[in-house]
Regions:
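Short helix-boundary/capping micro-motifs
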Residues: 10-28
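A short LG(V/I)-centered, amphipathic sequence patch enriched
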Residues: 40-57
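Alpha-helical linker/hinge and terminal dimerization helices associated
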Residues: 42-43, 64-85
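Central regulatory/effector-binding core of bacterial HTH transcription factors
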Residues: 88-151
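Hydrophobic hinge/microswitch elements
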Residues: 126-131, 135-139, 145, 199-255
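Short beta-strand->loop
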Residues: 158-168, 244, 251-265
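Secondary-structure junction motif
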Residues: 185, 189-213, 276-280
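A late-sequence structural motif
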Residues: 255-291
């Protein structure tokens, strides 16, 4: 069960295709198939179901995937610790879409300029999945917003995670021009909310403010970008909630109505004890950006 076999397995699990995984890895498909078969023989269980040229993880494969990803993460962490970060390596950073758009470009550009040997691998998603990915070792750290009912730093500590406040964001409801007379969330007449898929803190706050949960009048349109959400609002078809810092970056029409929705902190979370140089450099860069 060598690291290369684990990397091949994780790639095939991600692509669910030997051909695509082989292209991604720069290997021949036959060699990828052989390594997967050897890994299955070593473990003593089938990791994939193969039917009609399609692949899917078996129950054993799904369980093994989490461990394989964690083992690879630990190997990378050990390499960082032993070399003192001299060889660069990879720091896997997760982020909400809003933070990636409004806060990270300057921070990560400054980091790269100072530590060019370290590769920053950025992925985005809702806060809850990001927290889980940090907990299980799929990510080294992540910028998230904690839901009001989450329990704050104490709840993170129970998960074995540490945290540090990064930025305070002012949230706002963005409404169509037809909502010009609205003064509070209860006045909103448009009954369609544009939001990211479930698991995002901002979506939960919007649903609470607007009384979406349990309502037969409201519907939620799931979208993949703030640009699409803003366009939907401009078309008069929905409302959305977003940080004011993101709205400031957009070309939203001045005719759209905004209502303040309160502040929320963006925090950086990581596994307690995670102390590789590349991450310490990120903490230092974050501190420098805040000062």
């Amino acid at each position: 069960m060598d690291p290369e076999s684990l990397r091949i397995f994780c790639s095939v699990a991600s692509e669910l295709s030997v051909t695509q995984a082989a292209a991604r890895l720069g290997r021949a498909p036959s060699s990828v198939t052989t390594r997967i078969q050897q890994l299955e023989a070593d473990i003593g269980a089938e990791l994939f179901v193969r039917t009609n040229k399609r692949m899917a993880l078996t129950a054993a494969g799904e369980r093994f995937l989490e461990y394989a990803q964690r083992l690879l993460a630990l190997a990378d962490e050990a390499r960082h610790v032993v070399t003192g970060g001299r060889e660069g390596g990879t720091l896997r950073v997760g982020s909400m879409e809003s933070t990636a758009a409004s806060r990270l470009p300057a921070l990560l550009a400054a980091y790269h300029a100072r530590y060019p040997a370290t590769r920053l691998a950025l992925s985005t998603g809702p806060s809850r999945p990001l927290i889980e990915q940090v907990r299980t070792g799929l990510l080294d750290c992540a910028f998230v917003a904690l839901p009001p009912a989450f329990g704050g730093a104490a709840a993170l500590e129970e998960l074995g995670l540490a945290s540090r406040a990064a930025w305070r964001e002012e949230l706002c409801l963005l409404l169509p021009a037809s909502e010009a007379q609205a003064r509070r969330a209860a006045d909103v007449a448009t009954r369609s909310l544009a939001a990211f898929p479930q698991g995002g803190t901002h979506r939960g706050i919007a649903e609470d403010l607007l009384g979406v949960a349990g309502s037969t009048q409201w519907r939620v349109q799931e979208m993949s970008s703030y640009h699409t959400m803003i366009a939907c609002v401009a078309a008069g078809a929905c409302v959305t909630l977003l940080p004011a810092s993101v709205l400031a970056l957009s070309d939203a029409p001045a005719s759209l109505k905004t209502l303040p929705a309160g502040p929320i902190d963006t925090v950086l979370v990581w596994r307690a004890g995670f102390d590789v140089p590349a991450f310490q450099h990120l903490l230092a860069q974050l501190g420098a950006a805040a000062s």
